[in-house]
């Protein structure tokens, strides 16, 4: 299993223009309040989105939520389904906002 990623590492990847699949598993109201331009797939809808994600099965997928708990669950789900490079953002959106603001 691939290591999780810190907010600082995520910001470096974004700033460098690196390619990865970026998913936000929070709820729509949380996404509207603040987001990092990730694709919104609320955790409860993740099972129905699996087919859309299958083409990215062997690509780096970075998942975040508010604090890291829901994205941790999403990482486990995708890893169990054979996705090979799934990373959870440690601290999530709260840590991003603490370090970098909105």
Where are these regions (language model features)?
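Rhodanese-like catalytic fold shared by cysteine-dependent sulfurtransferases
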Residues: 1-21, 25-60, 66-102
């Amino acid at each position: 299993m691939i290591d999780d990623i810190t907010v600082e590492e995520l910001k470096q990847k974004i700033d460098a223009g690196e390619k990865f699949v970026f998913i936000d598993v929070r709820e729509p109201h949380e996404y509207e309040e603040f987001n990092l331009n990730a694709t919104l797939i609320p955790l409860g809808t993740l099972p129905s989105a699996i087919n859309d994600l299958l083409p990215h099965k062997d690509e780096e997928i970075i998942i975040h939520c508010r604090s890291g708990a829901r994205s941790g669950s999403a990482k486990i789900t995708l890893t169990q389904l054979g996705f090979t490079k799934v990373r959870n953002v440690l601290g999530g959106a709260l840590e991003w906002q603490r370090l970098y603001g909105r």
